[in-house]
């Protein structure tokens, strides 16, 4: 029911008109008997107020004679979360026992004595107070000269116990002790009734009635008011004390704005002024401040009955205050402006004309309002103000009943009041005991939270069931359907918590930290049912207390009203099997004050509505009804933004429709549609028919004197796409998918989104195919894992659908599937290495056809890290091999057989030489069978050569010798040839020494040559000597001597020394040459001598000395790359030509002997 109270007030500036919207959340309880519902109509100047109130009734209870109305105004709405919750140590100590008698169901006509619980947990409101400007700086405001009679008649409604709400007349009398004008506010109030009949409003005449004589109108003229302002003050005060909860008062209709829970208070003050930015509390003089609890009779704050704490303060503002200066108002730490919503923004302070004096901000942590003055204080002087602020017990800081000393302060000046905090009792009938309150209202999400205590008295309850209804319940626990329903279904959040035996529930009926209780919600998964907007929880037999937290949705009315009600009931069986019921209902009551202006009736402002339809546009053409499969979309969130930036949201119904009401003409609004999950907005303005097109996700509309029901929008399901293709074995390694190349199964493929987050993993099927589904448009990354035994093939060689894309590739989805992401692999090839170990009998490091392999030589293979990966032995032919090797670096280690010696290394081609004891080898895409090694047995050579040559020559000759000596010495290595003779000697010495391994050679040559020549000759000698020496590692000495002499000497010296390895050779050569002898000496010494003279002397000396000794050289143990060659030693094992020199000297001595002999003979011939 909506009661509209219109009042008029006169100030120095003339008539004013203000409005206050208030919301009260109420609660009432029912037993099995009658139900008493109490509603409190809040009247005052300010804005909206939300209160949680409850009424309790039992069948044997008595009812109060009447309820009283409080004049209240909203200050702020936000719960202060900075304080900590006190531990709940006080048990639920009270109960209202409602055991019924059969006759108790009859309605009683006598007044009852039952305690009525009107629990208000709500947003606060403030009374606009009069601020009087005594000395105003030049102003053009004029006072109306026309006499205005404002007459209000107040009639007392008869007391009727069948009515939910009764009223009683005000008994206050006019006072002349203070000068004050109170602007009144037009207020609209909505009382949501229950099962009880409502009182009949009394007829109200448009008169001002004296408070002390309700039936006699008091006519007051403007002139009287000017002369006696106190009279006006009393009239307004009496009017504000009048109970309007059940008596609508006729008033001039004014505009009623959409009602919202956020506070918009108005404080009546004198007039504005301006500049500064510092705190001026010392320039604020507090003239009066009081704290009033509820009706002020007992200072009991019945927190669940909607009893508020009213703080009144009157103060003056010093003329030194400038624009930007600030002042503070402090709440007590145990109260909050609102315990239902989170909106605590204080209202601006304005004067009766609406001009802003100061703007306020609220600090949740300190519970302090800071007002910043505007330039109003620069324009006006002697400003007086009175504020009335409402607050409520903070259930977080005061969880249980207690006594408090509340302290409020204006500009640092404090006042205090002792208060007793009282909380509700559980409703009890038999073993059924239950209580509940609304605890949180969220207008943005359109949800209401309710907390229910089940069995708070911890009785032993049998067959316990609890109903949560989206409407009120009657006294038998039955559901009362009607207006004010919430939505109770499977989407309703219902949490159940068990209270341990050692835990006490806070009496505040509000839990802030549920973690301290055991969450047993899951135990009710199969014990919870829904039917007809009711949830039923089956608790069975219990003896513990439980807490139920319910968060339900509601749908505001088209004109923005919060028409919300929700009930709960508990039923148990007694020992006879009869049910006992106890129940509570919580609901919101909306009140709205309006005020008249200037004594004339102002026509009520007409309000308008907007809205229409949201549908699924299957064919995406942006036009409604073009496809038979198109259908309305329910539960789409639609948000309306008002011109001041505030918002309101509603969801589309089952038919896709939505609607917003209470909109003003000429104002511009914005409607936004939330895109549902999995959908995309359709085409905008697809037709010229505004009733059939889609207006998009956001549309702005201006009200032009009529409703606009053409704001539609369409959505279509967001398409999903696939990505993937193929992994195959690229047998020919060309990176192209050929028809005969098979797929590879079980290859792991990973999909990542554009941020690198893994969103899917799969493996290829038996044919090598893979696919990722349900993907949106966008960029993706696909990673292929290389399967064991395979190598990735070349990539990007041809078209996308036939090539290989690499191990990591990017795929783009743009309104179509992408099935082109392929990857090819080929089987990784394996290789072998090895070859041969042989007995190198001739120690030359080369594999000869006659040399045999060595069996059972251990060969070890290491990888690049030095890890042994294989060991084998050579077979009977000396062969070995390692197989199944990948390309890479390896080391082959040969273990030297006992008694054998490593032969020389790297003497010839890789496949025929010896590579040494350790060989590094690299395999690159091919086998390697060139890793060989050879060994031989160790030997020792000792050669001792002792040569003793004694030559005695005595010659006496006179000769004329013409000697032509041509000495040609070709020496390999170091050759030292000294020839001083008239002879031709040709010496050819070939020495070949081949020594390997450890060989010890000791050669000792001792040559003793004694030549005694006595020559007396007269000789004319012409000698031409030509010596050419060429050294090339081979010594060839050729000496040719031509001698012409009368003497014929034939000397033959034969010396043969042969030394072989492993033998001791002693050579002793003794040559004796004597003149006058014919000597024919044949020496195996490659010496050729031609002599032409008077006497024929033919000396042919041929000396061939071959020393077949090997001087073994122990090779170094080296580790080298297989392809490097070591420098070869000389074949003799040494780089000198000692034996050649010995032969040369022997030949020279023989030639010298011949010359002496030849000279002697020539002398004799003469």
From Swiss-Prot:
Residue spans of biased composition, Basic and acidic residues class: 61-75, 92-108, 130-145, 221-246
Q: What is this protein called?
A: Serine-aspartate repeat-containing protein E
Gene name of this polypeptide: sdrE
Q: Where is the CNA-B domain?
A: 607-719, 720-829, 830-940
Motif (LPXTG sorting signal) on chain? 1129-1133
Principal subcellular localization = secreted
Q: Which residues carry this modification: Pentaglycyl murein peptidoglycan amidated threonine?
A: 1132
The answer to whether keyword Transport applies is no
UniProt region (Disordered), positions on chain: 54-253, 904-1141
Q: How does it sit in the membrane?
A: Peptidoglycan-anchor
Q: Which organism is it from?
A: Staphylococcus aureus (strain COL)
Compartments where found: Secreted, Cell wall
Q: In which residue ranges is the amino acid composition biased (Acidic residues)?
A: 908-918, 935-1105
- Propeptide stretches are 1133-1166
What positions carry the motif YSIRK-G/S signaling motif?
A: 23-34
Pfam families in the cross-refs: Big_8 (PF17961), Gram_pos_anchor (PF00746), SdrD_B (PF17210), SdrG_C_C (PF10425), YSIRK_signal (PF04650)
Q: Which positions carry the signal peptide feature in this UniProt record?
A: 1-52
Query: Per the record, which residues fall in region Ligand binding A region?
Result: 53-606
